[in-house]
């Protein structure tokens, strides 16, 4: 499903700030895998996610997804089939736009049958409301509220929904509960487990929480 072969990346080569972030990394995921990644800060975990998502082009090696070579594919094209959540709840949503508008953007971006000029229909809105209700956060009754008014946990739950609104081939979770309080983090992790399982999503999750890594993943990499 995901085949990463000997990828390497050096930032600022030839300068005093040169940093070898990835060095001959190999990784293989089967369809439906939930793989968790544990490691110290600066070990290159987030850089690996950046390489997969297309945030930059690797210096060498290949990345294949469902047999397609995506090594040189730009990030905006990969976003149609790769979902990603960051540690910071402020990333992944547009704070000045409403909940409905954020969901509409995510839906239109990921849906291959839509163009950027497509219009969200009443049926689409009903679908958004139904999905929001499944979060059990009351957001289905606040669709016209700006996202900037939501708590960190609510925003992260919304971002999770946006990333999976159209089922991605691969979901990248980059310590997506690290900035939340323990109770909220547990709720978001439970939502993550539910959404991933129900939609049979292949998932990679970075975490420093060993119990979460062992309970959620069918394989853990250190």
Task: Explain the meaning of each model-derived region.
Residues 1, 10-24, 74:
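A short, flexible loop at the N-terminus of ABC-type nucleotide-binding domains that lies
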Residues 15, 69-83, 91, 114, ...:
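ABC ATPase NBD coupling module
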Residues 38-40:
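The feature captures the beta-strand-to-loop junction immediately N-terminal to the Walker
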Residues 53:
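Helix-to-loop junction immediately C-terminal to a conserved catalytic motif
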Residues 61-69:
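Conserved ABC transporter NBD signature motif
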Residues 163-164:
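ABC ATPase C-loop
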Residues 175-176:
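Walker B catalytic motif
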Residues 207-208:
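H-loop/switch region of ABC-family ATPase nucleotide-binding domains
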């Amino acid at each position: 499903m995901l085949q990463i072969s000997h990828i390497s990346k050096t930032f600022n080569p030839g300068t005093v700030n040169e940093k070898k972030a990835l060095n001959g990394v190999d990784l293989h995921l089967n369809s439906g895998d939930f793989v968790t990644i544990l490691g110290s800060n600066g070990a290159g975990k987030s850089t690996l996610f950046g390489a997969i998502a297309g945030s930059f082009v690797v210096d060498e090696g290949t990345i294949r997804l469902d047999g397609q070579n995506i090594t040189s594919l730009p990030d905006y094209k990969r976003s149609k089939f790769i979902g990603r959540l960051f540690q910071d709840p402020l990333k992944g949503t547009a704070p000045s736009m409403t909940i409905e508008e954020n969901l509409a953007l995510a839906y239109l971006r990921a849906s291959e049958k839509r163009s950027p000029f497509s219009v969200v229909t009443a049926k689409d809105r009903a679908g958004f409301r139904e999905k929001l209700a499944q979060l059990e956060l009351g957001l289905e009754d606040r669709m016209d509220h700006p996202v900037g008014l939501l708590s960190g946990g609510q925003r992260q739950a919304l971002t999770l929904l946006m990333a999976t609104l159209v089922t991605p081939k691969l979901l990248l979770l980059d310590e997506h509960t690290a900035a939340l309080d323990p109770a909220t983090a547990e709720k978001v992790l439970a939502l993550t487990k539910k959404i991933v399982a129900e939609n049979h999503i292949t998932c990679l999750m970075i975490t420093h929480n060993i119990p979460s890594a062992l309970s959620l993943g069918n394989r853990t990499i250190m």
